[in-house]
Amino acid sequence: VAVTGKRGCLAVLGTALLLAALLAIAAVVAWRHYLHFADTPVPASAPSVVIAPGDSLKATLRKLRAAGLVQGAELEWQLLARQVDAAGKLKVGEYALSPALSPRELLTRMRQGRVIQYRFTIVEGWNFRQLRAALATATPLQHSINALDDAALMARLGFAKQHPEGRFLPETYVYQRGDSDIDVLKRAHAAMDKALAQAWEQRAPNLPLVSPEQALILASIIEKETALASERPLIAGVFLRRLQLGMKLQTDPTVIYGIGSSYDGNIRRRDLTTDTPYNTYTRTGLTPTPIAMPGREALLAAVRPAPGEALYFVAVGDGTGAPAFSATLAEHNAAGARYLQRRRLPSTPQTETTP
């Protein structure tokens, strides 16, 4: 009987060891399967997925399934979320579903809030009409200002009495899904305020400018006159010397701005003599408002002009975009004649009333 009992115990022990071995093998296989799931890139049929406020891991997983990411059981996703400390910590936003992204990397990004970043660029020299048109087509921004006129828009921003022209700094602004056009404009407005204040603090002494607002106006004119950074301080010097002497600025971009949306790409002699608040051929001093969005270099040029004696400048016409600067009207007319000769047009000497 004792032998039989001993054999029975050995049989039970053997069975237990076999079961333990099988369970261990199964555990190893399951773990390897889990690791393969967690660390193998999986393609999706959609480019992105959006986690909305209140979405749980289960809700997010349903969205991933709908986006074509079908690998892995729900239990594996739950285990992985705990392993990467993402359980209950997924951040709201839009996430890219890259073919090279593994589930582990995806959940880590969702925990860290590494959402898709979009970019909107305000181009130097744009006017506010152009800015609004570009902003209206930016996706996936939420659009809330399309029905507002400029005055109502500025009131919405908190600047009810401020003209919008020139008030938004040309830069590239990063945003994400869920942001609005108002969010972008607020940031661009704050950036311009800061850039203008910094430029004004660096202003040269004895400028004929009494406020940062005047510097902004002049910077916008400089911005429209040239795209060459090296020429901006020189052009600023011409305009500032003319202001000091009480001379009219006589610059075409201000006339074009005054013409408005009816401008057809050509500026005619009658345009130079038709008075508008922005016609610097008929009016002395700066324009009532900026005429464009000046960049940082134009802002700095307006308050730190290059030294010199030039009171005039005209296009050289050599394809570089660089102007010729002159200290006297005679020199200026000669430079203008050379420019017109390059264009094979008849030269008309200018008078003291034209730059």
Regions found by a protein language model. Name each.
Residues 3, 14, 59, 350-353:
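Intrinsically disordered/low-complexity terminal segments and short unstructured peptides
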Residues 11-14, 18-19, 62, 330, ...:
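Compositionally biased amphipathic helical and low-complexity segments enriched in hydrophobic
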Residues 8-12, 54-59, 79-83, 92-94, ...:
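A broad, low-specificity signal for short, low-complexity segments enriched in glycine/proline
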Residues 56, 133-142, 154-355:
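Bacterial extracytoplasmic/cell-wall-associated proteins, especially those involved in peptidoglycan
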Residues 2-5, 11, 24, 51, ...:
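Generic detector of intrinsically disordered, low-complexity, polar/charged segments
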Residues 31-199:
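Signal peptide-directed extracytoplasmic domains
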Residues 15-19, 86-89, 126-129, 236, ...:
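Short low-complexity stretches enriched in small and charged residues
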Residues 2-45:
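N-terminal type II signal-anchor transmembrane helix
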